[in-house]
């Protein structure tokens, strides 16, 4: 099994989209790469902790490659906008790809380079090692499953 952590604005929609992909075996939402230990949702929303809202993804490489998974990710974000996705504004809504294994970096960079060809503006999506991940509160986990009419800025069709 492999793991990747993706930031694509509000984490509810990113998780709902990713968990529908064949080969994804686990998802959970949380906060990554900030400077405060175990922050609360309210703290992250203050834009003072440095965290991004993220979706942790564990996937089976025999069913889906990191490259294909990233292709899905690029479809649901605007990678040229900084600190915003849809109507959600703030540094916690930035886009990012946070990896735990150095060998994934080449695939991630190649994926970004392929996507850049589709845009006139530069892609501003962060690509960084995962420094810290904290689970979000339970009420955020599988939020759109628990609240089918809940807010989501992305198209959940795969």
UniProtKB/Swiss-Prot annotation:
Which Pfam families does the UniProt entry name for this protein? PMSR
Which Enzyme Commission numbers does its entry carry? 1.8.4.11
| Entry keyword Membrane | no
Q: Which residues form the active site?
A: 10
Q: Which GO terms describe its cellular component?
A: cytoplasm
Molecular function terms, GO-annotated: L-methionine-(S)-S-oxide reductase activity; peptide-methionine (S)-S-oxide reductase activity
**What does it catalyze?**
L-methionyl-[protein] + [thioredoxin]-disulfide + H2O = L-methionyl-(S)-S-oxide-[protein] + [thioredoxin]-dithiol; [thioredoxin]-disulfide + L-methionine + H2O = L-methionine (S)-S-oxide + [thioredoxin]-dithiol
The record's family statement is:
Belongs to the MsrA Met sulfoxide reductase family.
Q: Name the HAMAP family for this protein.
A: MsrA
Q: Per its database record, what is this protein's job?
A: Has an important function as a repair enzyme for proteins that have been inactivated by oxidation. Catalyzes the reversible oxidation-reduction of methionine sulfoxide in proteins to methionine.
Q: What is this protein called?
A: Peptide methionine sulfoxide reductase MsrA
Q: Which gene name does the record give?
A: msrA
């Amino acid at each position: 099994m492999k793991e990747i952590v993706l930031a694509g604005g509000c984490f509810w929609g990113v998780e709902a989209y990713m968990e529908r992909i064949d080969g994804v075996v686990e998802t959970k939402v949380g906060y990554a790469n900030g400077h405060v230990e175990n922050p609360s949702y309210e703290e992250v929303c203050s834009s003072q902790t440095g965290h991004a809202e993220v979706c942790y993804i564990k996937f089976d490489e025999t069913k889906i490659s990191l490259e294909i998974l990233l292709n899905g990710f690029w479809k649901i974000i605007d990678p040229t906008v900084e600190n915003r996705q849809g109507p959600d504004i703030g540094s916690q809504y930035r886009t990012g790809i946070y990896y735990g294994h150095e060998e994934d970096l080449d695939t991630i960079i190649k994926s970004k380079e392929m996507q850049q060809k589709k845009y006139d503006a530069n892609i501003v999506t962060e690509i960084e090692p995962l420094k810290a991940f904290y689970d979000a509160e339970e009420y955020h986990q599988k939020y759109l499953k628990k609240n089918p009419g809940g807010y989501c800025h992305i198209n959940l069709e795969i």
